UniProtKB/Swiss-Prot annotation:
Keyword Iron appears in the UniProt entry: no
Subcellular location: Plastid, Chloroplast outer membrane
Chemical reaction(s) catalysed: S-ubiquitinyl-[E2 ubiquitin-conjugating enzyme]-L-cysteine + [acceptor protein]-L-lysine = [E2 ubiquitin-conjugating enzyme]-L-cysteine + N(6)-ubiquitinyl-[acceptor protein]-L-lysine
Membrane-related topology note: Multi-pass membrane protein
Gene for this chain: SPL1
Membrane-crossing residue ranges in chain numbering: 1-21, 224-246
Class in the EC hierarchy, top level: transferase
Protein name, entry field: E3 ubiquitin-protein ligase SPL1
UniProt topological domain (Chloroplast intermembrane) ranges: 22-223
Zinc finger (RING-type): 291-326
EC number: 2.3.2.27
Induction note: By infection with the bacterial pathogen Pseudomonas syringae pv. tomato, and treatment with fumonisin B1, a mycotoxin inducing apoptosis-like programmed cell death (PCD).
GO biological process: protein ubiquitination
Function: Possesses E3 ubiquitin-protein ligase activity.
């Protein structure tokens, strides 16, 4: 599971890195056009070599704008929706308002951008637009009055039509837009902007400078996210290896501690085999005050948790539990004798 999560993070980091590079290439490929009057000459020079991706700003205009049915707003894209609102009686015999969305209708006309110095046609369908349309009109049309018999039948059925709400959303004439796309010539020789087969394409209300800055910030965020995911993936993948190395180091240290303790016991046994001359004895004078581990040095430490005093300082540092009661050792106190 750790390996799978690690590989997933690494793949996510690689994907974000590729997205970062793609966004960076998109930013570098965009040619900013500050005045539309210069676009004709720019297309003449550069579009012959590679597809020319430009970024332009201007106000929306059209020779044949669409007029909203319920208002005087003119636009180039129109989306009209109708919502029938009714009252229904539920099982508690209370009336609840419900609505049913009818089939929406869309319209669009040829449009262009105009910045005061020139204009350029934009060949973008409403499906490719990706803009939040402005509400041109929002009208509620009440249902026609019904006869007394029809009203009584509707009451008995638990159904009453309130009316229809008509909402029209448009891209109004004069709306400032920023368009990033490919500049080409149409069959009439006029310059138009269209969606490129490969490359960036944006239609937004954001000004040109803010759009470029936003794309740069987005690229940097993707870069940092890719680095973070990659590092996390490497850590998750290498975690079993790190745990294995630490376990081997711990086993090696434990084995050396045991060998050291065994060597001390063997050395102590060899010394005890020699004649014992006077030396340290217990308080009763019967048994030497020797460490119970090495049986060589006198015990001079006490374990705070259990209170036993039975080991010398070197042996107490090698132990994890008390050799008498097997309680875990947390703190060792050294005892000084007079």
């Amino acid at each position: 599971m750790i390996h799978l999560a690690g590989f997933t993070c690494c793949l996510g980091g690689v994907a974000l890195y590729l997205l970062t590079r793609s966004t960076g290439r998109d930013i570098k490929s965009i040619t900013r056009v500050y005045q539309l009057k210069d676009l004709e000459q720019l297309v003449e020079v550069e579009s012959k070599v590679v597809p020319l991706i430009i970024a332009v700003s201007g106000d929306v205009g059209s020779e044949t704008p669409i007029k909203c049915e319920h208002s005087y707003v003119l636009g180039v894209f129109l989306k009209r929706t109708a919502e029938q609102q009714v009252l229904r009686r539920n099982w508690r015999f209370s009336w609840v308002r419900n609505s049913t969305l009818m089939q929406p209708m869309t319209k669009e006309v040829p449009w262009y951008l105009d910045d005061g110095t020139g204009r350029v046609n934009v060949d973008v369908s409403q499906g490719e637009l990706g803009l939040a349309l402005t509400v041109g009109s929002d009208v509620f049309e009440k249902a026609e009055p019904v006869s007394l018999v029809q009203g009584a039948l509707g009451y008995l059925k638990g159904f009453k039509i309130l009316g229809v709400r008509h909402v029209e959303r448009v891209v109004p004439i004069g709306t400032p837009l920023t368009v990033v796309g490919e500049a080409v010539r149409d069959g009439m020789g006029n310059v138009r902007i269209q969606k490129p087969e490969q490359g960036p394409f944006y239609v937004t209300y954001i000004p040109l400078d803010q759009l470029i800055s936003k794309l740069g910030d987005l690229s940097r965020r993707f870069k940092y996210a890719s680095m973070g995911l990659t590092v996390l993936g490497v850590i998750l993948i290498s975690k079993p290896v790190i745990e294995y190395i630490l376990k081997r180091i711990e086993d090696t240290l434990e084995r050396r501690r045991r060998q050291f303790a065994l060597k001390r016991v063997v050395d102590a046994a060899a010394r005890r085999a020699k004649p014992v001359t006077g030396g340290g004895t217990s308080r009763d004078g019967d048994t030497p005050d020797l460490c119970v581990v090495c049986l060589d040095q006198k015990y001079n430490t006490a374990f705070v948790e259990c209170g036993h005093m039975c080991c010398c300082t070197p042996c107490s540092l090698q132990l994890r539990t008390c050799p008498l009661c097997r309680e875990r050792i947390q703190q060792v106190l050294k005892i000084y004798r007079h």
